[in-house]
Curated annotation (Swiss-Prot):
It comes from Cryptosporiopsis sp. (strain 8999). It catalyses: atrochrysone carboxylate + H(+) = atrochrysone + CO2. It is an enzyme of class 4 (lyase). The lineage of its organism: Eukaryota, Fungi, Dikarya, Ascomycota, Pezizomycotina. Pathway: Secondary metabolite biosynthesis. Decarboxylase; part of the gene cluster that mediates the biosynthesis of the dimeric xanthones cryptosporioptides. The pathway begins with the synthesis of atrochrysone thioester by the polyketide synthase dmx-nrPKS. The atrochrysone carboxyl ACP thioesterase dmxR1 then breaks the thioester bond and releases the atrochrysone carboxylic acid from dmx-nrPKS. Atrochrysone carboxylic acid is decarboxylated by the decarboxylase dmxR15, and oxidized by the anthrone oxygenase dmxR16 to yield emodin. Emodin is then reduced to emodin hydroquinone by the oxidoreductase dmxR7. This is Decarboxylase dmxR15. Residues 31-126 form the EthD domain. One of its GO terms (molecular function) is oxidoreductase activity. Belongs to the tpcK family.
Length: 146
């Protein structure tokens, strides 16, 4: 696998006009915490505490996808020869923003440092959780499907 230097990474080979970066956190819950307690903390404690700060720093969208045992079991109905490996993450959290500097500034905010850094240790296994970032490609036309 080739390694990109910083200038290559910051200058993709396509236009990023009107595109969002998406930080995806593939999260594991803290050892010993139940699925229900993990989801409850993220939805009812962390989200309300985080939302206004994200808006302040230009975050355009934030989603949480909780992969509890009951929904993970549904995957057995979708497996086929090409798609048969089940991800064991407890949650995917996705944060959409236009500029990585905005997100970096949010992490430097004193309120973030005082409240949110500690909160992650309450519910997340921060040593096992993983992250990635990429440009979002949207395919419209699904608005009237439901």
């Amino acid at each position: 696998m080739s390694v990109l230097n910083e200038s290559e990474a910051l200058a993709p080979s396509f236009s990023t006009k009107d595109k969002y970066l998406c930080l995806t956190i593939c999260g594991y819950r803290k050892p010993g915490m139940s699925e229900g307690d993990y989801r409850n903390h993220m939805v009812n404690v962390s989200a309300p505490m985080t939302k206004d700060l994200m808006v302040k720093y230009g975050v355009k969208r934030w989603t949480q996808i909780h992969n509890q045992s009951a929904t993970r079991a549904l995957m057995s109905q979708l497996f086929d020869p090409q798609m048969c490996n089940l991800a064991d993450f407890d949650c995917f959290s996705q944060v959409f923003f236009r500029n990585i500097d905005d997100y970096k500034r949010m992490k430097l905010d004193p309120w973030y440092k005082k409240h949110l850094m500690h909160d992650h240790e309450v519910f997340a296994d921060t040593k096992r959780s993983m992250m990635t970032i990429g440009w979002v490609e949207e395919f419209n036309g699904f608005e009237n499907v439901l």
